[in-house]
UniProtKB/Swiss-Prot annotation:
A molecular function (GO) term: NADH dehydrogenase (ubiquinone) activity
Topological relation to the membrane, as annotated: Multi-pass membrane protein
Matching Pfam families: Ndh2_N, Proton_antipo_M
Protein name according to UniProt: NAD(P)H-quinone oxidoreductase subunit 2 A, chloroplastic
Annotated family: Belongs to the complex I subunit 2 family.
BP GO terms, sorted: ATP synthesis coupled electron transport; photosynthesis, light reaction
E.C. code: 7.1.1.-
Organism name: Nuphar advena
Localization, UniProt: Plastid, Chloroplast thylakoid membrane
GO cellular component: chloroplast thylakoid membrane
Function (record text): NDH shuttles electrons from NAD(P)H:plastoquinone, via FMN and iron-sulfur (Fe-S) centers, to quinones in the photosynthetic chain and possibly in a chloroplast respiratory chain. The immediate electron acceptor for the enzyme in this species is believed to be plastoquinone. Couples the redox reaction to proton translocation, and thus conserves the redox energy in a proton gradient.
Quaternary state and interactors: NDH is composed of at least 16 different subunits, 5 of which are encoded in the nucleus.
């Protein structure tokens, strides 16, 4: 009898929770319509996988890509709408959040074609891979719109858990297992430090969790200049630093890049930085409004260390993925300049513009790495020697993306860096911009070294891996090459049409 009553109470409680969730979704669903599209895509993937056989795998890719494209379309239709706060203040929609969500969706849309042939060749589980990618994308989108401390913690954990699973997806690979272990341990430690910083903010503001209410609470309690805020600032900087992976919080990056499946690395290398940058700008700019000098100093130190260490250590690398890992550490140093400049002097606009170009440059380079790895089974930089003689398209595409990463005119990377450094110079960050210019010259050296290997035509320098390289026929419609074409175009053409891109980026205000 007691069990029967308890069972009825459980059913009633579950029904109330479900009805409350349905009520929230019904009245607030329009605010998260792009996210709802991804959720429905996830449900469809599960239904198709459980009711069909392996022959229906093209449908899985189609549903994943379609849900991402539809989500992008929904975001574009919502552009320029008035800022709105929904879900009892937990979520905010405005142009600033939406452009970061667009960048995350764009990354995921380009990464799925990169993964098709890789998954088929390595015989990885397709459905789970796509589920993790879409769920990580969903977590990144919620993080961009998060407006309170709880959502800011839960959303990146959703992204991080999927990232851990993706990095260890090739369970039989020892390097993949090692990468996952390091990633998980350091990710758990950083999350703990982040929560510790949030607890100081929560206590100092008098129990507030919404970002703007925290500012009001700090004013009411007169705690905005207290030592507790300094502790919160340092702890939150460390926690977010793990997601952005600037020096000295970069230790996990090279090992995870080298050990994880290459399409996963391509996905993580851009989406994690976009989502973390969106979160960092809101956290530093709103709750720490009264401590702007302190967090500016912290970020300047991180930017200098990242630009110097990342680019110098990248020179010594022999693996393409490890080289790009250290290159990404240097690149995030450039992005931090935009965060420091802030909304004044177009700092955020320059950061968004550069991140858009960085996505295309980075994914285009990873597309070549995925293709070369599938054809040869190697990742060593020296083994790329003479690739132009066997696959001119792949070699030229990789060369263009690397030149754009180095900031060579008239490619997109040059104009992105020029705009970013110019905004930093106008804001008075002369030393920081000077370091950025010098380290950009250093980066050009190791990018050109790789390009020289790609273009060499002397038989004695062509490696056995390239001699045995088999290019896929044009009629096979290789999805990797499709992504590569899109990324190469985006890495070159936008350089001569910067004004519309900058105008859109400047329209992103809190």
């Amino acid at each position: 009898m007691i069990w029967h009553v308890q069972n009825e109470n459980f059913i009633l409680d579950s029904t109330r929770i479900f009805m409350k969730a349905f009520h929230l979704l019904l009245f607030n669903g329009s605010f998260i319509f792009p996210e709802c599209i991804l959720i429905f895509g996830l449900i469809l993937l599960l239904m198709i996988d459980s009711t069909s056989d392996q022959k229906d795998t093209p449908w899985l890719y189609f549903i994943s890509s379609t849900s991402l494209v539809m989500s992008i379309t929904a975001l574009l239709f919502r552009w320029r709408e008035e800022p709105m706060i929904s879900f009892s203040g937990n979520f905010q929609t405005n142009n600033f959040n939406e452009i970061f969500q667009f960048l995350i969706l764009l990354c995921s849309t380009l990464c799925i074609p990169l993964s098709v042939e890789y998954i088929e060749c390595t015989e990885m589980a397709i459905t789970e891979f796509l589920l993790f990618v879409l769920t990580a994308t969903l977590g990144g989108m919620f993080l961009c719109g998060a407006n309170d401390l709880i959502t800011i913690f839960v959303a990146p954990e959703c992204f991080s858990l999927c990232s851990y699973l993706l990095s260890g997806y090739t369970k039989r690979d020892v390097r993949s297992n090692e990468a996952t272990t390091k990633y998980l341990l350091m990710g758990g430690a950083s999350s703990s430090i982040l929560v510790y910083g949030f607890s100081w903010l929560y206590g100092s503001s008098g129990g507030e969790i919404e970002l703007q209410e925290i500012v009001n609470g700090l004013i009411n309690t007169q705690m905005y200049n207290s030592p507790g805020i300094s502790i919160a600032l340092i702890s939150i900087t460390v926690g977010i630093g793990f997601k952005l992976s600037p020096a000295p919080f970069h230790q996990w990056t090279p090992d995870v890049y080298e050990g994880s499946p290459t399409p996963v690395v391509a996905f993580l290398s851009v989406t994690s930085k976009v989502a973390a940058s969106a979160s960092a700008t809101r956290i530093f700019d709103i709750p720490f409004y009264f401590s702007s000098n302190e967090w500016h100093l912290l970020l300047e130190i991180l930017a200098i260390l990242s630009m110097i260490l990342g680019n110098l250590i990248a020179i010594t690398q022999t693996s393409m993925k490890r080289m790009l890992a250290y290159s990404s550490i240097g690149q995030i140093g450039y992005v931090i300049i935009g965060i420091i400049v802030g909304d004044s002097n177009d700092g955020y606009a320059s950061m968004i513009t550069y991140m858009l170009f960085y996505i295309s440059m980075n994914l285009g380079t990873f597309a070549c790495i995925v293709l070369f790895g599938l054809r040869t089974g190697t990742d060593n930089i020296r083994d790329y020697a003479g690739l132009y003689t066997k696959d001119p398209f792949s070699a030229l595409s990789s060369a263009l993306c690397l030149l754009s990463l180095g900031g060579i005119p008239p490619l997109a990377g040059f104009f992105g860096k020029l705009y970013l450094f110019w905004c930093g110079w106008q804001a008075g960050l002369y030393f920081l911009v000077s370091i950025g210019l010098l380290t950009s010259v250093v980066s050009i050296y190791y990018y050109l070294k790789i390009i020289k290997l790609l273009m060499t035509g002397r038989n004695k320098e062509i490696t056995p891996h390239v001699r045995n390289y088999r290019r896929s026929p044009l009629r096979s419609n290789n999805s990797i090459e499709l992504s590569m074409i899109v990324c190469v175009i985006a890495s070159t053409i936008p350089g001569i049409s910067m004004n519309p891109i900058i105008a859109i980026a400047q329209d992103t205000l809190f």
